[in-house]
Amino acid sequence: ISKNFDKFSYDELKNYEYKGINVGKKSLTTISWIIRTSEILDHHREYLINSIKSCIKIIDFLENFDIKSFSGVLVFNGLTLPESIMYEWCNKNNINVATFESGWSIENEVALELNYSPSPQHLFTFDDRKLSEHENKKLKEYIEKKRISSTNFNSPTDKKIISIFGNVSWDTSQTVSSNVYESMYKWLDSLIPIINKNKDLLFVFRAHPGEYREIKKTWYGLEDWFRNNKSKIAENTICYSAKDTVDSYQIIENSELVLVYNSTIGIESIIFGTKALAAANTHYTKIGFIESFESATMYLENLEKTLFNKNFDLDVEKMNQASSYYFQLLSEVAYNFGEINQNLRFNEHTLVKKYQTSSFNIDRLDKTLISFLNRDPLEKKY
């Protein structure tokens, strides 16, 4: 590679395109995974340079490889390297391509999602319908199972509560979601003046438990941000770390308003009857049950107005819509393989030995693969 990237500025590297593909931007997602934070700065430029060089080699390889002779291409995730380059290149060349990754399961089982968009976005065709009594019961059971090992939330004051829920800042879903704010931390920074202005309210920060899970252990999480900024923030705040077992749903139930970045807590808050504002764009923010915004300015203006007017009311229709959306996401999109999954060490999995000879109650992919070859919908419900 003859190009001397050492002379490029950090911004030039971030926006560098090669043969119509923004390899600079696509590198950011994977670098975030390497450094375990969304805060990619100038001193990370060596990661960026090496990643761009790798992307160029992949694109040159694909141009000289007869991939058009294949009926379809399946790639993992679609947002991380090197698969994101393959995904983008196939789309640019009108090659049938889809992504796969672990999906959601209302049975809390191992599941596989197939999607024509990058699978971490979890985009699907939502049927805006009311759930049956049986479906509502299943959804309630799913949520209740998630809170079994939680400990009670006890507010230290009688002030009205505004809760703030973070996410795993460097997760692959963040790159495509962060188009209102540059990152989750920029959003948190912007909340400080509002917190200080509303001392009659208690602001409860809750770090995402995923920050503490072995496979997603975060080196700089919400708790670290809170500790580093504590001197700038008024005393009307408390923060629960990722390893704290406090019941997040109990926090929601005791809140007047929930502020989320892009986690599914946004959906669950509405289901529990608590109004929520989303600070990033994600798979559920354009459905209608949660408020989302095109810019940080619009977000902050709406938040201030909501707090000033105490506009915390929520329509039952939105609660029903959120429940319907969540149920469909959990049960009609991904394919369950729970019965043939065998857990190994460190979040690894394999198939049980008898998966080919014994009868298991799992979702089959025969028709799905035919749908893929015909470029038909890939969701389980089809």
Regions found by a protein language model. Name each.
Residues 52-65, 178-179, 216-267, 271:
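Donor nucleotide-activated moiety binding/catalytic core segment of transferases
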Residues 96-120, 278-305:
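Catalytic or ion-translocation cores adjacent to nucleophile or general acid/base/metal-coordination motifs
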Residues 76-78, 82-87, 110, 243-291:
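A donor-sugar binding/catalytic signature common to diverse glycosyltransferases
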Residues 141-228:
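Conserved catalytic-core segment of nucleotide-activated headgroup transferases in glycan assembly
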Residues 103, 168-170, 209-211, 245, ...:
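Active-site-proximal loop/turn and secondary-structure-junction residues that shape catalytic pockets
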Residues 1-56, 102-146, 346, 355-358, ...:
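Conserved N-terminal ligand/cofactor-binding loop architecture of enzyme catalytic domains
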Residues 118-123, 128-159, 298-382:
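C-terminal amphipathic helix plus adjacent low-complexity
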Residues 58-112:
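Conserved nucleotide-sugar donor-interacting segment of glycosyltransferase catalytic cores
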